[in-house]
Structures are given as structure tokens and as C-alpha cells.
């Protein structure tokens, strides 16, 4: 029997897609379907979590030259 679920379509570049896939590998409850290289169907209740985690992960990778001046 076919089962329908409500989902949210996420469009992103492949690098962000890889981060979301890594998040899902830990939890296995975020992604419903990988549609192609730039589209994912995700659980609508997890969208805010995805945004929060992406902001956290991306902020770790931001270079701030002022940090070097403070540490010098």
C-alpha cells in the first residue's frame, strides 16, 4: 500500500547538500528522499534544526582576521 508523507523541498548547492546528508547520517530522520544533486525532500519539522545546524557548521569555517589580531 502506498503511503503519503508531507515534506519540504530543499534546494541547495552540492556542498550544503553534503552537510545535510552528514546530519542525516547521524540521525536518519531528516531526509525523506534525495531527488538530485541540488534537491532534497526533508521532514518539515526538521527544517529549523537544519537551518540551525548549517549556521553553526558554516560559522566554524569563517575566517576572521580580527581573531588573529586579538591573539597576537
Swiss-Prot record:
Keywords: DNA damage, DNA repair, Nucleus, Transcription, Transcription regulation. It is found in: Nucleus. One of its GO terms (cellular component) is transcription factor TFIIH holo complex. InterPro entries: TFB5-like_sf, TFIIH_TTDA/Tfb5. The keyword Membrane does not apply. SMART domains: Tbf5. The keyword Nuclease does not apply. One of its GO terms (biological process) is transcription initiation at RNA polymerase II promoter. Belongs to the TFB5 family. Component of the 7-subunit TFIIH core complex composed of XPB/SSL2, XPD/RAD3, SSL1, TFB1, TFB2, TFB4 and TFB5, which is active in NER. The core complex associates with the 3-subunit CTD-kinase module TFIIK composed of CCL1, KIN28 and TFB3 to form the 10-subunit holoenzyme (holo-TFIIH) active in transcription. Component of the general transcription and DNA repair factor IIH (TFIIH) core complex, which is involved in general and transcription-coupled nucleotide excision repair (NER) of damaged DNA and, when complexed to TFIIK, in RNA transcription by RNA polymerase II. In NER, TFIIH acts by opening DNA around the lesion to allow the excision of the damaged oligonucleotide and its replacement by a new DNA fragment. In transcription, TFIIH has an essential role in transcription initiation. This is General transcription and DNA repair factor IIH subunit TFB5.
Amino acid at each position: 500500500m502506498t503511503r503519503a508523507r508531507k515534506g519540504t523541498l530543499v534546494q541547495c548547492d552540492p556542498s550544503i547538500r553534503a552537510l545535510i546528508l552528514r546530519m542525516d547520517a547521524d540521525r536518519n530522520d531528516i531526509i525523506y528522499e534525495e531527488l538530485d544533486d541540488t534537491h532534497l525532500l526533508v521532514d518539515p519539522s526538521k527544517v529549523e534544526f537544519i537551518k540551525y545546524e548549517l549556521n553553526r557548521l558554516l560559522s566554524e569555517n569563517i575566517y576572521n582576521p580580527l581573531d588573529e589580531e586579538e591573539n597576537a
